[in-house]
Amino acid sequence: LFSWGNEGHPLSQEETTPVPARFDYHYNDSVLASADYIKQHLHDIQLLDARSLAEYNGHKAFANKAGHIPGAVHYEWTDALDKSKNLRMLPTTEIKNALAAKGLNQENTVVVYCHSHHRSSLSFYVLRAAGFTQIKGYPGSWSEWGNLADTPVEV
């Protein structure tokens, strides 16, 4: 909506009447990671933390523990948005270069997380658009990891 309105496209405040429709889907849980999965695979996965730098560094804590999952790289979800183009996604070549500079490799499984998997769900899409194929989202994210007694943390 931000981009749409700022680019001069029409907006309306009229109410619309929903039209019934059928939506068929296949639930694919192979793209999800759990806390147990991450603990078991810390040595052979890559982690992308999509939270703010203050959350990643442990300066802001919204859980019992502050910091990030060991080995996680920071790539805030907004880093993929072009502020000069109404928050449209940056060109994939720029995103690929930024992720490569952080050490993320397309051949490895990358698990994305934030605090509640809202921000990192965009990061999941961004990685997919940038050509990553082995991506998992962590729905529990920091709201789970940061409150579990047996999870390691880095700051």
Q: For each of these PLM feature ranges, what is it?
A:
Residues L1-Q46, A50-V155:
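Rhodanese-like catalytic fold shared by cysteine-dependent sulfurtransferases
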